[in-house]
């Protein structure tokens, strides 16, 4: 089937609505919407929830941009895209909870299509979701990865292991020699065997995110915590900022295409701290995190 960008866009708009409704049901607060237009072509809907409830900040962004030439961040690993016009659309979200026992989560699903006269379109899907705990709970990690594995199974037994490894490899801070979190799924450049198959997989990932995340939120949101746990959460959020500004391809793509800076940087935590040469106390729950986030098979 020929790629249908309109069909993908409608799914993404509905997905944004659904995820916002589900997060509001947990938190009680409403998202504030900010619709924007991109001067060079396209626009989007940025939605942000900020309050003193379960989520300190949650951002769920839809964007649909188009232009006459692909940016350097995209053509660097796909030189055949040079000289083509493009459309890029997606839903990207990050949830930063108040409670340090509730992990931060990130999800993204996206579609690219690049065209030029007299040539077949070049298109692909990408996306995934990943979890960044501050305090590790094995049952949460197992649930997260089991949900990821189960949504992948209808598409092939090799899909989950392949995209889990890609996630582990991608969300890695080289300058710290550590993972950003416990991973999940990451895929990109997906265009085989055909459009319908790839679109169905992208939909499964988009819908699977809340199945993976919300049960963990419900399990941890009422746990008691104090200043020590909060300070550690803010310190570890620094890793999130470092990854997004130094390594993340999506951030680079958005900035290089003249995307809306407020929406691109919506993933940043509202509060964060750095501490020079911080060393957690031996045997403490904080010290245990470095082992917990090391790559392993959770299911």
From Swiss-Prot:
Location(s) in or outside the cell: Cytoplasm
NCBIfam families: PRK05330.1
Subunit structure: Homodimer.
A GO MF term: coproporphyrinogen oxidase activity
Chain's role: Involved in the heme biosynthesis. Catalyzes the aerobic oxidative decarboxylation of propionate groups of rings A and B of coproporphyrinogen-III to yield the vinyl groups in protoporphyrinogen-IX.
Family: Belongs to the aerobic coproporphyrinogen-III oxidase family.
Protein name according to UniProt: Oxygen-dependent coproporphyrinogen-III oxidase
Annotated region (Important for dimerization), positions in chain: 240-275
Essential cofactor(s): a divalent metal cation
HAMAP family reported in the protein's UniProt record: Coprogen_oxidas (MF_00333)
Keywords (A to Z) from UniProt: Cytoplasm, Heme biosynthesis, Metal-binding, Oxidoreductase, Porphyrin biosynthesis
List of residues binding a divalent metal cation: 96, 106, 145, 175
PANTHER family hit by this protein: COPROPORPHYRINOGEN III OXIDASE, MITOCHONDRIAL, OXYGEN-DEPENDENT COPROPORPHYRINOGEN-III OXIDASE, MITOCHONDRIAL
Example GO BP: protoporphyrinogen IX biosynthetic process
One GO CC annotation: cytoplasm
Pathway terms, separated by semicolons: Porphyrin-containing compound metabolism; protoporphyrin-IX biosynthesis; protoporphyrinogen-IX from coproporphyrinogen-III (O2 route): step 1/1
Active site: 106
Organism from which the protein derives: Shigella boydii serotype 18 (strain CDC 3083-94 / BS512)
Residues binding substrate, per UniProt: 92, 108-110, 258-260
């Amino acid at each position: 089937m020929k790629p249908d960008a309109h069909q993908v866009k409608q799914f993404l708009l509905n997905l944004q609505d659904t995820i916002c409704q589900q997060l509001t049901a947990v938190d009680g607060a409403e998202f504030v919407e900010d619709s924007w237009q991109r001067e060079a072509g396209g626009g989007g809907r940025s939605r942000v929830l900020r309050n003193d409830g379960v989520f300190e900040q949650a951002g769920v962004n839809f964007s649909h941009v188009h232009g006459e030439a692909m940016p350097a961040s995209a053509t660097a690993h796909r030189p055949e895209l040079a000289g083509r016009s493009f459309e890029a659309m997606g839903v990207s979200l990050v949830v930063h909870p108040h409670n340090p026992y509730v992990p931060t989560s990130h999800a993204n699903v996206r579609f690219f299509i690049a065209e030029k006269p007299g040539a077949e379109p070049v298109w692909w899907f990408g996306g995934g979701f990943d979890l960044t705990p501050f305090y590790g709970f094995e049952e949460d990690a197992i649930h997260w990865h089991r949900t990821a594995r189960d949504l992948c199974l209808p598409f092939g037994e090799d899909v989950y292991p392949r995209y889990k490894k890609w996630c582990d490899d991608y969300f890695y801070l080289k300058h710290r020699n550590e993972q950003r979190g416990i991973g999940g799924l990451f895929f990109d450049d997906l265009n085989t065997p055909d459009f319908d198959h790839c679109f169905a997989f992208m939909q499964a990932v988009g819908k699977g995110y809340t199945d993976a995340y919300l049960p963990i939120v419900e399990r941890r949101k009422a746990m008691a915590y104090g200043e020590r746990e909060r300070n550690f959460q803010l310190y570890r959020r620094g890793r999130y900022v470092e990854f997004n500004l130094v390594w993340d391809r999506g951030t680079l793509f958005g900035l290089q295409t003249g995307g809306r800076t407020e929406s691109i940087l919506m993933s940043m935590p509202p509060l964060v701290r750095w501490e020079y040469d911080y060393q957690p106390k031996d045997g403490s729950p904080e010290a245990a995190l470095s082992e917990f986030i090391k790559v392993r098979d959770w299911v």
